[in-house]
Amino acid sequence: MKMINSIFTHGSLIILLLLFHSISIKAQEVDDEREFDYLEGSELGPEKWGELRPEWGTCKRGKMQSPIDISNPVQVTSKELLQTKYKAQNAIINNRGHDIMVRWEGDAGSILINEREFDLLQAHWHAPSEHAINGTRYAMELHMLHRSTDPKLTPTMVVVAVFYEIGDVDPFLSRLGPIMSSLIDQTNEHKQAGVINPMEIQLDDECYYKYIGSLTTPSCTEGVTWIINKRINTVSSDQVKLLREAVHDHAKNNARPLQALNHREVQLHCHKDRKD
């Protein structure tokens, strides 16, 4: 009987050890699912992005990288600036682990720049802001990614960016808040958001910064036209907190470090009647 009890105890110990090992491996697999992070000094951090995959080499070697510190822009006045032709369309909200993204499932409209059309694909947020103005970073930055309707022409991508400082709630985020709350820590999960009108995002198309840069996440593809609103919108601290809670710990501050300007020109485009 003692032998049976001994065998049973020994067997139980082995089972527990195997179970613990299995859980440990599973936890390791979850951690390894992320391909990059924003943690300074991490093996997957921004300074290592260009070494993680061959196709991400531009993150390290590129000379036209984003984000940048915007200072001393060249003033440009014009009668015709950015034109928005957005329209309401069904969308989904996706927790990508490193950010929260709204992706429109159909034709959500486009923007016109120099008589060229770029379709709106998705929008996502970074906190704090990725770009800076004279060394100042803001509480949050929204990116709206657009792709050219003619892929044979360059640039093929345009990102419209909006800065936010802490203040009144942002109406667009308020509408999406309940869905975002349901996606907290639900990496790679998405939910239908119904019909979302991009016009609800308060853009300033009469005064904006413009320069040529890159995507701010791997693969850091260059040749991206950046349109950054000069006007600063507001967002509540609770809304920023929600965006940070929804993603993994490694992405609560999901802003890439500032990149070298490398003699690129930054322009400030304002309508001829604009006074600011």
Curated annotation (Swiss-Prot):
Every Alpha-carbonic anhydrase domain range: 34-270
Cofactor: Zn(2+)
A Pfam family assignment: Carb_anhydrase
UniProt-annotated glycosylation sites, renumbered to this chain: N134
Binding site for Zn(2+): H124, H126, H143
A Gene Ontology molecular function term of the record: zinc ion binding
Pathway annotation from the record: One-carbon metabolism
Catalytic activity: hydrogencarbonate + H(+) = CO2 + H2O
Reported tissue expression: Confined to nectaries.
Stated name of the protein: Carbonic anhydrase Nec1
Gene: NEC1
